[in-house]
Amino acid sequence: MNELFYTAPDLACIIDNWDLTVNDSSDLIQKIFQQDKNFLADEYRNDYRKLFLDVRYWSDYLCDKVTFDKEFPAIQKDCGGVLDDTNFVNDDFDLDLFFKSLRIKLLYIGEKKYVRMKLRTLLSVYGYKRRSKEFIFYLKDCLKFYHIQTSLRGKICDVAEINLDDMITFRVV
């Protein structure tokens, strides 16, 4: 479950995806630290400065990722090859980033307090065409962890039982 907590790279990616200004992103980081502290990774829960600086670092990295990735072999050589490159050159963010982004959008960024989408669209975010038991189990874990409720035509629904083309409404409860 540790992968479900907000990390600096996650927040930087969300800020980048929503194209927030520096002031808006600073306000967002502060709101998350003050109001959503329980969802932050352990290393950030009691250290706003570390959270802020790490998110800024990763935001800068995302702005010029191609250049940083080109320079990484030289940096690795200078450090004697001891740096772990998985966080730097990996283009695949965690699948749970979708739910982190959804929760943050609903609470802090968007004007609406709900998001609607088809289950088929949600599956395509993960690269699936059909729902599997494992996917539904993971989906339910994320929904429960982030306190996100799903409803269909105003009634609470179970994502395992609805049709792929049903329009689901997501809300933070």
Can you describe what each PLM-predicted range is?
Residues 1-23, 99:
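Short terminal alpha-helical segments
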Residues 16-26, 34-43:
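Charged, low-complexity interaction regions
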Residues 22, 94-101, 131-133:
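Structured alpha/beta or helical-core interaction and ligand-binding surfaces enriched in interleaved
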Residues 35-64, 123-159:
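Charge-enriched amphipathic alpha-helical scaffolds
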Residues 41-97:
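Long, low-complexity, charged/polar intrinsically disordered regions in eukaryotic proteins
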Residues 97-113:
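Short helix->loop/beta-hairpin flanking segments within DNA-binding domains
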Residues 109-130:
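Short glycine-rich, basic-tinged beta-strand/loop micro-motifs
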Residues 155-173:
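C-terminal edge-of-domain segments
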